[in-house]
From Swiss-Prot:
The active site is at residues 137, 542. GO terms for biological process: carbon fixation; oxaloacetate metabolic process; tricarboxylic acid cycle. One of its GO terms (molecular function) is phosphoenolpyruvate carboxylase activity. Keywords: Carbon dioxide fixation, Lyase, Magnesium. This is Phosphoenolpyruvate carboxylase. It comes from Pseudomonas putida (strain ATCC 700007 / DSM 6899 / JCM 31910 / BCRC 17059 / LMG 24140 / F1). InterPro entries: PEP_COase (IPR021135), PEP_COase_bac/pln-type (IPR022805), PEP_COase_Lys_AS (IPR018129), PEPCASE_His_AS (IPR033129), Pyrv/PenolPyrv_kinase-like_dom (IPR015813). Its EC number is 4.1.1.31.
Amino acid sequence: MTDIDVRLREDVHVLGELLGETIRQQHGDAFLQKIEDIRHSAKADRRGPGEQLSSTLADLAEEDLLPVARAFNQFLNLANMAEQYQLIRRRDADQPEPFEAQVLPELLGRLKQAGHSNDALARQLAKLDIQLVLTAHPTEVARRTLIQKYDAIAGQLAAQDHRDLTSAERQQVRERLRRLIAEAWHTEEIRRTRPTPVDEAKWGFAVIEHSLWHAIPSHLRKVDKALLEATGLRLPLEAAPIRFASWMGGDRDGNPNVTAAVTREVLLLARWMAADLFLRDIDALAAELSMQQANDALRKQVGDSAEPYRAVLKQLRDRLRATRAWAHSALTSNQPAGADVLVDNRELIAPLELCYQSLHECGMGVIAEGPLLDCLRRAVTFGLFLGRLDVRQDAARHRDALTEITDYLGLGRYADWDEEQRIAFLQAELKNRRPLLPAHFKPQADTAEVLATCREVAAAPAASLGSYVISMAGAASDVLAVQLLLKEAGLTRPMRVVPLFETLADLDNAGPVMQRLLGLPGYRAGLRGPQEVMIGYSDSAKDAGTTAAAWAQYRAQENLVRICAEHQVELLLFHGRGGTVGRGGGPAHAAILSQPPGSVAGRFRTTEQGEMIRFKFGLPGIAEQNLNLYLAAVLEATLLPPPPPQPAWREVMDQLAADGVQAYRSVVRENPDFVEYFRQSTPEQELGRLPLGSRPAKRRAGGIESLRAIPWIFGWTQTRLMLPAWLGWETALTNALARGQGELLAQMREQWPFFRTRIDMLEMVLAKADAQIAEAYDERLVQPHLRPLGAHLRDLLSQSCQVVLGLTGQPVLLAHSPETLEFISLRNTYLDPLHRLQAELLARSRSREAALDSPLEQALLVTVAGIAAGLRNTG
């Protein structure tokens, strides 16, 4: 065990001790002893077939339920914080740099050895286009208030690492830790009300303000340094290899709370926040840039000012203040922007560049390369809008709107037309100069909302918006329909309209749809930049299981690369991944390197969801590590793409996918008891009551198909069966081995990044799954006639584990990663009581009608939050 491991254990021990002291102060020694007894029972039950823990929890008095749940939840959050800090802890001089810090310099060395010239490397790095799209899927259980306290705790862990602290200073740090832990303990974990879409957007802005704002300039300094050392060339000022976008306040698919008015409000709040953040930077710069000497270009702008740099910054500061004031007043009025309001990012960047060039020309390069360069990098990356807001809506809503319009105009019903009729109508109207809608048209509420959203898109500055994403897209007409609605709303500039292919059938059909679309007269001429296509991971996995879904996603991308090349159109693939394996999640670096060759051509767009935003970008140091991984992976996938899979591998994958989907659907779709078992054995029904996201957990109607991917995954994760991530693989791999394909599978795992990544992700999720915990839920919650189904599913889980061990040749899952195994083991001591307590609470809750704010229901919600924190990638 390294010294680093020892320090992590010490941190966890100290935080646990301080939490214990806090609990003792509020609840007394006897209660703290009860917590310790529960923890020891959990450990004992892990070592043998004990029932100690369940009986201890069943005997808990009603008033103890909530504080017990809170104690274990708080400990897991503190352990998370310690683990996160561990990743960015300062190393001693004799310790190696973490992989994330070395990944780019090492890659640049390999690329040079592979024959890439210095110029080519610098050019490619400068034009990388990586977009991380922050989304507010309701898996971020922790409240923002608590997240800020946990971040402050990380700050104190860093403070106590300083070797030169006096004993008094060390005591001060411990007191601050004690106070922060007490503050967290006395703060409610669970929101009493659902967040609004605007609340979610503010949470996204907070991630930028507290973390990414600091991480980006530091990350780009290191990229610049690595490039300079490898090639002798600098990263250009205008380069922004990684930018951010958001769905918070723009994603209205299935969320009636995201209206046109909400989208307008979020766009204005982003402008207010950006102006405010840049004002802080400019104030600091104005204090520093007191120099007198300036070049002619700067003098031309400010005349004979004794402090020319401050004069330039004052002009910019005045305009930023005007922008902030206007954005604030526009939230409550329709006040138009005055001439002083900044609208174009160049208006922000140009004065900063002017100062930068002048300082260099006047021999003050060392000053130019300081905070001024950081501010410039932020201006290029975040701009006046922080990031671009995407709009997303279901294709059916556009079809319904057009049907109402054509019906009103006496043209027939758009919904009843075939694809060719729709395309002919849409193309004719897109060319037509007259408006489609008469001024006196009064649409139904749903159509009015679609049209109002399009008007907001048309009115917003181009740089404030990203893509208009069409979920459940299935035809070329779905894209043209949105283009026509945007034209009707007055949009005159190009906007990326992006079909999202998400079910298995839609993924298989993505190629033909795009072939048809790109072949339409005039369509390609209207494209400005690449054709963007979104690949859905969540719904395809829920529809067909991860075996078939992963292969369908891979094949769809291959087809799209080929078709776009045939039409001489550049392609941007947008990956709609979740935090979990069942929703396309997993380590980003490995995932990017496992994409089909040619699919990452210097461009990569992906969603970052829910709690994964906090784990990957919550602290500046961790954000920097993840930005490094993204940048290096996209550069490597662009310049050293993997070879295409061998024909024999494709045949194996075809068979694995066919066997996987059949095995998955035989359980999920064809077993008549399955839905009832799911509802009884997991907290799925109760999750709908959780005030998590602004979006309902279900679509408008239906059974398992109507359930959104998130509660579907979340429910199985809470019980540790993890079913969506592995179901189907056990049969597919067992059948392949029975066909004598073991050596071929081993070859695929060794030589094909796509297959290796799939198996690695499968192994990770199986290591977190726990049949014993899942069985405990069944025993407490499931009616006797449904229990054989649970036993069958646990047998399939065991089969999955055995076949993966056979494939990897390891004695236990994750044997190659003892540190990860140790983390899982450490967490289980605190997770086990939460799981058993949750099963007990569900049983009590279902036997009576409890009010949402009763201690019983609150305790239940806390167990959900605690398990989510303990398992991290929850949904």
